[in-house]
Structure formats: C-alpha cells, structure tokens
C-alpha cells in the first residue's frame, strides 16, 4: 500500500505542514509539536518511503511533492527541513495557490557544491550513496552526527535524532539512495526567484551541511525572501533552540 502517514493536531485557523529531512521521520518534531499545535492546525507527515509511509520506492522530487500534496489541506504554511525544504519549495513552485507561506529550515536550493556555490562536495554525497549499500544504519548515523556537530548541546541533539530514526523501521536503501540523489542533483536557485508567497529561510550558523555563506548569496538572489540565522545552532535549530524557533513561526503567522 502506498499510503502517506499523516497526523493532524491542534485547532488553529492557520494550517502548518512540517516536512522532515533525509533518513528521518515526523517524530523529529516532537520537541516542538505541542507548542506549535497551540497556535496552528499542525500537520506531521512522514515523507514517502520514510517512517510509516511505506510501500514507496525512490521518487523524484516532483513525484515526492505530488504524493505529499494529495493529503494536504487546501492552503497551509509549508515548512521543510533540509531535504524537506526542497519538497516544500517544489510544492510552492508547482502549486503556489496551496502555499500561504514557504519556510525552509537548514535547507539549500542546491545542496551540492558547484562553481562559486558553497555546498556539500559531490564526492561526499556519492560516498554516502556507496556506503549505504555496505552498512546503511552506520551511514545514517554518521549523517546525523554531522548535523549537530559544533553546538553546545551536540551530543544530546545527536541522541535525539538517533532516537527518532530508531523509533521506527529504517527506510529501504533505495529510498535513502533516492533522497541522496535529490540532494546531489536538484538546483532550485533560479526557479525560486519568482515565488509569490512570503518566504522565510532559517539557518544554523554552525551548520556543516548548508554553509552560512549561502545566506547572503540567496538574500541577493531572492530579495523578496527573509533570512534568519540561529547563532549557536547547527543543522537542526528546532532541536537546539525550540523556543526561539517557535517564536519565529508564530510571528510569521501574524503576517500571512
């Protein structure tokens, strides 16, 4: 069965859909879901092939976005973390009428380093793909450790991420590989210049996967968007700075 796992909480007049990152599932939001569901009608989603959304193989970004949209409210703020940021961005590009505001968290329109564009070196992503077939649990754990490195709470944040992964069955290797392929190949820098809705980009100053150098570059490329950097966060600011993170989303709600 190809079913997207979807949970709705709260009674707010604005809908907020949260999309998680690579290798993870919607349990990653448990540190903030109570707070957010007191302000929004909150939608927690396991991306196709991840967590409880079983029965999917590797999907393209476009197919992943369409699969998620089928169960979504008519209009919502879409928030995507890391890989989820690409999915939310794709939805904003193809179905702008469904997106009240777009929020990307520790995400890049182009994760892979290119000429004069900072990002993850393509051989690092290719290495992760190679290691997946050898020892995919260890590969996922390495990727998670990278996400919290450098923060004051790095160890406990990494434990929180690992617990999220281990709480549910691991995704299939081809699903994980497909997610890495999206991170390796997708480039939405130019298309996102023209999104019509409010667009908020959140970053961690210490993020080892999305270099902070991209922030001023995107400020220039997307002058209609707003950016905010969590000074002491890495790749998962909602885990290390949950109160500050929720404040920003509640403030955004007042503006849309």
Curated annotation (Swiss-Prot):
Pfam family, one: Abhydrolase_1
Residues covered by the AB hydrolase-1 domain: 15-242
Location of the protein in the cell: Cytoplasm
Keyword Hydrolase among UniProt keywords: yes
GO molecular function annotation: pimelyl-[acyl-carrier protein] methyl ester esterase activity
Binding residues for substrate: 22, 82-83, 143-147, 235
Catalytic reactions on record: 6-carboxyhexanoyl-[ACP] methyl ester + H2O = 6-carboxyhexanoyl-[ACP] + methanol + H(+)
GO cellular component: cytoplasm
Enzyme Commission code(s) on record: 3.1.1.85
Catalytic residues (UniProt): 82, 207, 235
Superkingdom classification of source: Bacteria
Gene Ontology terms describing biological process: biotin biosynthetic process
Pathway per the UniProt entry: Cofactor biosynthesis; biotin biosynthesis
Alphabetically ordered keywords of this record: Biotin biosynthesis, Cytoplasm, Hydrolase, Serine esterase
Entry function: The physiological role of BioH is to remove the methyl group introduced by BioC when the pimeloyl moiety is complete. It allows to synthesize pimeloyl-ACP via the fatty acid synthetic pathway through the hydrolysis of the ester bonds of pimeloyl-ACP esters.
NCBIfam families linked: bioH, PRK10349.1
Subunit details: Monomer.
Family according to the record: Belongs to the AB hydrolase superfamily. Carboxylesterase BioH family.
Protein name listed in UniProt: Pimeloyl-[acyl-carrier protein] methyl ester esterase
Originating species: Escherichia coli O139:H28 (strain E24377A / ETEC)
């Amino acid at each position: 069965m190809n079913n997207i796992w979807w949970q709705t909480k709260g009674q707010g007049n604005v809908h907020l859909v949260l999309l998680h990152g690579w290798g993870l599932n919607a349990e990653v939001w448990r540190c903030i879901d109570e707070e957010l569901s007191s302000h929004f009608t909150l939608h927690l989603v396991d991306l196709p092939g991840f967590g409880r959304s079983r029965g999917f193989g590797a999907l393209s970004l476009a197919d992943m976005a369409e699969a998620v949209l089928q169960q979504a409210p008519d209009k919502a703020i879409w928030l995507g973390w890391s890989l989820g940021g690409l999915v939310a961005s794709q939805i904003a590009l193809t179905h702008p009428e469904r997106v009240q505001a777009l929020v990307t968290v520790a995400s890049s329109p182009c994760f892979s380093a290119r000429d004069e564009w900072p990002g993850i070196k393509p051989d690092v992503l290719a290495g992760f793909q190679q290691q997946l077939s050898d020892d995919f649990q260890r590969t996922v754990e390495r990727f998670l450790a990278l996400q919290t490195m450098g923060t004051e709470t790095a160890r406990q944040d990494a434990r929180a991420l690992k617990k999220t992964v281990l709480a549910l069955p691991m995704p299939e290797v081809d699903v994980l590989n497909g997610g890495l392929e999206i991170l390796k190949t997708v480039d939405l820098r130019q298309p996102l210049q023209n999104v019509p809705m409010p667009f908020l980009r959140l970053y961690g100053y210490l993020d080892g996967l999305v270099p902070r150098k991209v922030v001023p570059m995107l400020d220039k490329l997307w002058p209609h968007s707003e950016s905010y950097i969590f000074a002491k966060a890495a790749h998962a600011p909602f885990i290390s700075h949950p109160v500050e993170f929720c404040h920003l989303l509640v403030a955004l709600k007042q503006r849309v």
